[in-house]
């Protein structure tokens, strides 16, 4: 196998047994693809597909005026260019967006002509606001902050059948219901009541009998009965009736008389119940008719109107129960045929018929009026209004849309074969739904499971943005309709008709403040990827936390391979927010799909199919770990499979599909936990959640025991620099990498140069530090998509969230009681868990009523010492080390003129003293902060003079840009002359540039000429002359292009910044704060084993082994058994082996052993102990040495989830590393030097420092701000609040009888205003006494009682 640039430098020993059938897909595809589809940027007019923006425009346009004389049509749209790139947008605090220009056509019709002749057409491009662009990493920059739009898992549109689980009625009877959910529009519900009548609700309003809706659709009673029932036909034969016999219908009835066959043999005796056997005999006998007495039809319901044959008079209405009176009329009138409804109590209930009986309406108009009254109570109904309302509800494309998904789900559920159709409902749809509902009530068919992933779909960014955009367009439509009527008379253009504000506002609101638009979690690369792969059931149109029950949150069998069963937050959102599984993707309808290998006749093929939850139900799916032979045939007699959402076993011949990988079940975060299969699910959940909170350490350290997913996460997260094209590294320094692109990847006419600017020490959303470090050296060859620079938390292109620590599991002096962690001082000395945090502090100079605020170094009443870190403009120097209270930006604000005394006036007149007009409002370093200034940005309003600092910052930025462009030109020029040299050497010159005719051109000749002289050469061959001309033109062209680029950047930098109204200048100061690990910080492993650092011990006191190597961390062994996360123990053992092997390699290198010996040892590690074979023979000797040097600190291992290292392999590795196979060692106490009683498990575990740092939580207050009403101190660090002394604490003091302490707590330390001021003054005077007074809360209590109208007073004597 071919190794990439970074892979060959450090190969991971992989323990997986199963072959890689399919690579893990690009992890951010769900975001990028969705938004690309929405924008369809770069598509021409004919290429536009009916999705995204295009679909939104087409659904709202054309807009036709009320009179119908003018129309506005949509032609197409185009997106402009963004004003600033992503980095500039973040700095300036603006949105990264492009202008949207829409081409519309205004058509004015001729009023006079009868056939609507066109009078005038105007076409114009209209600006429709800005559309935010997605960055290449799937985020949006909104007002300068990176945000992510989380995908939503919502109920798919379509029709759903359900029952109330017996909860509505006291009898526990199941009440069935059906609900038609459109993509937009009114919901339609059908439901049974306890008396078995069917009702309908529109938009969850008051219920009406379902027959009202059918009547409103234009069905008569007879048509309704015809649709839902079959009929029994009776012929009247004098006193008796003859029934047209369908034997099946008699089943379960009691025979009213003997039933005889043709020969007179009795088949069923009178009074006997008719069974299936009897029915078989009847069918055999071929009896077509059955004589029954007249009263047999008593109580049955008529299916058709019964009419007097002679007079035409109606004897019985349709759907009437037959009684003796009607039967007498029938006999008298000599009616020959009666049709009754066939119903029974088992599988054909009289529900629709009963519903018709309770329905008060009798024709279509009455039904429409009834619906109008329900929808608009209190309004007088008219025929037109009722008809319009009803048509608009379900039959108008403007108001109702099922969407393609909805129509597909609808048709599938009611058993139609076609999956396409109209977006609105039709009569047949509604009848079909009712029929299905009645069938389910009759016991045919089953209800739906709403938590099945075939009934829930994912709405991604693009779709949600499109919906918001449509909302904005609909608002515009109303305004345009009104203006269209004026368009003709006033000769308006399309631009005058359309106001883009509502559209822009709708889009801005969605990206800025929607519940699903979340502030990007930038703790580390994993947290970014996880947020982008989230699916949330919350949000607009979704569930709410309070209403979501247990079922919705639970793991469902269809989650397999689509949604991770492990990763979900703890707390109120559990199960509502999920993560996509590693291989999952969405299909065209938005349902989640998972990949499977096709299996035919027990043979596993290479073909891979993606199936949604609905499609996979009928398949028999084997697990990825099913045993196969070399011919890829399943060899077990019975294979463990999933079928119909159940786990079972089947023969290999029955298997139709097979999983592609064992990790397709879990999400990215869970697949980073080694030995996940040995951890309890609850702890694995904590483990995957805590990896997201790991803070990037100063020096990233790859995990010794990983899972092989680390590289994918680092590559796809976008924090690393990945080569866009292959080539050779031309130059590299800390801030940029320049690649000369390989010739075969250069497109014609463009410079073969890629310049990658690295991000240096910038602030992330979580105030952690983002910094990239190059991995390549000058002259290295890189291929496309090789990793060239590491980002935060990545080490040689692998995710590295924490540090490998030598740990021992032992209880030690109570320092690790209750999950506490005992650390060695060495960890602090080596800066293993030191992190850098970057804080942004902002100073804003505004225009006030009394005059402008000024940023200056001239601050009143501030000593010289406080100003020594500021430059002449009053802004702190970069590189200054500052502490709490230091001035960062000097700023003075004018204050109102105070009345001056005559003496002051005199001094003013003499000295011109102005200092008292302004007060000092400088930006100071907040309390508890100490750090180094690493960057300063100054933004100045247009028209305000820029200070020296702003100009110097601008100059340095321009120098950087110029340097970049010069570099690009240098390489282009060099490459061009190289090509010319290879073309010219050995050819003959005609003259020019001081050469003689016929002189041969050699390298020496060319070296003797300046580059400019080359173009003066005249060659014998015309083709060469042409090449020279082209080269000259190309170089001149490039130079001009780069100069234009420079001017453009310069113009951008020099134009004023767009600041908020009233703001003159903004100065942003960035502080880098270095935080070492200290007691109180939270740490964790990857298995949910979290704890707080309790004590940092000197190295010499820590337990050490026989060689004197001390451990770094001592963990409590009691944290393992009850939590059942044994994965951490296995990780520790394998970590020990990895480290031991690294030490062996290190010794070999130090002894300068031959490369062949190294190769042999590496081969033993990689290829002789289980797992995947590595092709070390492909590496050159130098590469092997390089590899060995990188393995000195330990051989990294990969143990993929559910396919990891076995116990035997771990032992073999320990043996190879010359370590005890038990993984346990004899330790000695560093304090006493005594042996511990028994051997202790020692090894290497990957530990993370989580973003819950004691520095951010610790805080102290003596005095500060107080609450307005109660006058008690505020709470919380943000408000600089106090410690709460609550009700129970008061009880404790009462119980101890500590009266004075209690009095102090309730008065001077809390809300006795006079007492506390007095006490403060006393302390200042050195007089330590207090006089408690009346607490303010008492006054509040009195006021509250008075507000109830009770007069209450405090009697003082």
Swiss-Prot record:
Any GO MF annotation of the entry: DNA binding
Cited CDD domains: RNA_pol_B_RPB2
GO aspect biological process, one term: DNA-templated transcription
Family in the record: Belongs to the RNA polymerase beta chain family.
Keyword Transcription part of the UniProt annotation: yes
Superkingdom as given in the UniProt entry: Bacteria
SUPFAM superfamilies xrefs: beta and beta-prime subunits of DNA dependent RNA-polymerase
Protein name: DNA-directed RNA polymerase subunit beta
Keyword Oxidoreductase in record: no
Annotated organism of origin: Pseudomonas savastanoi pv. phaseolicola (strain 1448A / Race 6) (Pseudomonas syringae pv. phaseolicola (strain 1448A / Race 6))
Enzyme Commission identifier(s): 2.7.7.6
Chain segments annotated as coiled-coil in the UniProt record: none
Catalytic activity, reaction form: RNA(n) + a ribonucleoside 5'-triphosphate = RNA(n+1) + diphosphate
Enzyme class: transferase
Entry-linked InterPro entries: DNA-dir_RNA_pol_bsu_ext_1_sf, DNA-dir_RNA_pol_bsu_external_1, DNA-dir_RNA_pol_su2, DNA-dir_RNAP_su2_dom, DNA-dir_RNAP_su2_hyb_sf, RNA_pol_bsu_bac, RNA_pol_bsu_CS, RNA_pol_bsu_protrusion
